[in-house]
Design a protein with these regions (language model features):
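N-terminal, positively charged/glycine-rich alpha-helical extensions of SAM-dependent methyltransferases
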Residues: 1-23
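Conserved Class I S-adenosyl-L-methionine
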Residues: 28-32, 61-63, 181, 196-268
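Conserved catalytic/acceptor-binding region of the Class I
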Residues: 148-210, 225-234
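A short SAM/SAH-binding and catalytic strip from SAM-dependent methyltransferases
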Residues: 119-132
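A short acidic, Gly/Pro-enriched loop at the edge of an enzyme's catalytic core
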Residues: 109-120
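A short glycine-rich, Lys/Arg-flanked "PGG" loop and its adjoining helix->strand segment in the class I
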Residues: 133-145
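Conserved alpha-helix/loop element of class I SAM-dependent methyltransferases that forms part
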Residues: 30-50
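Class I SAM-dependent methyltransferase SAM/SAH-binding core
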Residues: 53-110
Length: 268
């Protein structure tokens, strides 16, 4: 697999999906790792000078958690719906014996924290929320005065090649449990919840593969398994692979684009 960088169903279904793929997730989740690293770098100027109290929503296997622990926070709370992913995250955090950290197997939209935070981090997660606008006012209450919400999201141009190829192969739009928002839409939702934008960054990350089968297997290992309302038949699968080859270039036979959006919001 080749990568190149250009500039910077429901809750239970998702839980089972990510539990099954936890052990393979780190090996294929380069876009998620890139987004986490970019968000972390963007957020550093907005953290307090004293050791912060941090919350990470949808920590997964700990791409971002490891960097946050490296800040030696006063406390780091990490939350995810997947028990298996939390276990992998916990193994990484054990490299920081002096850091107090806690793991919560919980849906972010139902979480009830027992403390307030200097910063809430949420990277590569909001696409799975059932009702993001309803969640944001609650999250704002979890912040200390002057606290920040650091958001990393996949924009609406994410996986556009896959969606185009699927429509060409099947004649149907590709359905998905995930909702990809534009930066403008995210800004509108956060401002309506009382947040103010401090900083933002955006780029397209290109992920290349040696053949269509490798590309589709990688999406499956990531947990991106939407295949439309009915499965593709054999003929449609062959057409899908042929359509994906149209995305190739001199470096890779198949390419997927990921729109990476990082935004820092102030809670008051």
């Amino acid at each position: 697999m080749v990568q190149s960088r250009k500039r910077f169903e429901c809750f239970e279904w998702s839980k089972v999906n990510f539990n099954l793929r936890a052990s393979k997730y780190d090996s294929v989740s380069e876009p998620q790792a890139e987004l986490a690293h970019g968000l972390f770098d963007l957020s550093l100027d907005y953290l307090p000078n004293t050791p912060p109290v941090l919350l990470e929503l949808g920590c997964g296997t700990g791409h971002l958690s490891f960097s946050l622990a490296g800040c030696f926070p006063k406390m780091l709370d990490c939350l995810d719906i997947s028990k298996e992913m939390l276990q992998i995250c916990g193994e990484k955090l054990r490299d920081f014996p002096s850091v107090k950290w806690r793991l919560f197997e919980n849906d972010a939209e139902d979480f009830e924290p027992d403390t307030q935070y200097d910063a809430i981090y949420c990277s590569a997660t909001v696409q799975w929320f059932k009702d993001l606008p309803a969640f944001l006012p609650n999250a704002k209450k979890w912040l200390k005065p002057g606290g920040i919400f650091a958001l990393g999201a996949f924009g609406e141009r994410t996986l556009q090649e896959m969606r185009t190829a699927y429509k060409e192969a099947s004649g149907r739009p590709l359905s998905s449990e995930a909702t990809f928002y534009s930066q403008k839409k995210l800004l509108s939702m956060f401002e309506k919840a009382g947040f103010s934008l401090e900083s933002s960054a955006e780029c397209i990350y290109s992920q290349g593969f040696e053949n269509p089968t490798a590309a589709l297997k990688t999406l499956n290992k990531m947990g991106v398994t939407g295949t439309g309302e009915k499965p593709l038949n054999r003929t449609e699968v062959l057409k899908l692979k042929e359509a994906l080859l149209k995305t190739g270039n001199e470096d890779s036979a198949v390419n997927f684009s990921w729109e990476l959006i990082a935004m820092i919001f102030r809670g008051d």
